[in-house]
Amino acid sequence: MLGEYRQGDADWSGGFAFAQFSFPGGGRVELLAPGNDPSGFVVKFLERHGEGVHHLTFVVDDLRAEVQRLRESGQRVFGENYSNSHWMEAFISPGLDGSRVLIQVAQSDQTSEQQDDDWRRHPLDAVLKAATRFR
């Protein structure tokens, strides 16, 4: 199965590099690498857990309602950000049972294609070159 490069940035403002690929049927995979900020969340994650899955994202129609539902069910929600209607997000804290994968819940007023057009920052080779400097 081949993925198609959709968007990426060699040093996103959040302090990390990313490349996102889409697959037939609608699935996407986003690869993260540390950016120029040595105190960024990707660096901290790698120091604590090593390489692996950081988070899974589920897109919902109403983020505020979903966050309320999650809290009412006993989930610990953090990192809520409602400041940009193009991408609002919250995270569910992993349990204390050893799981290290975060769950991201997100809402957008844009289609995936509109996000790709808005967020495409750099060609894939520039993103990969930036990411390999941390090997």
Regions found by a protein language model. Give the residues of each.
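Short terminal or interdomain "cap/linker" segment that borders an active site or interface and mediates
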Residues: 90, 96-98, 117-122
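A short, acidic/glycine-rich surface segment
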Residues: 6-7, 38-43
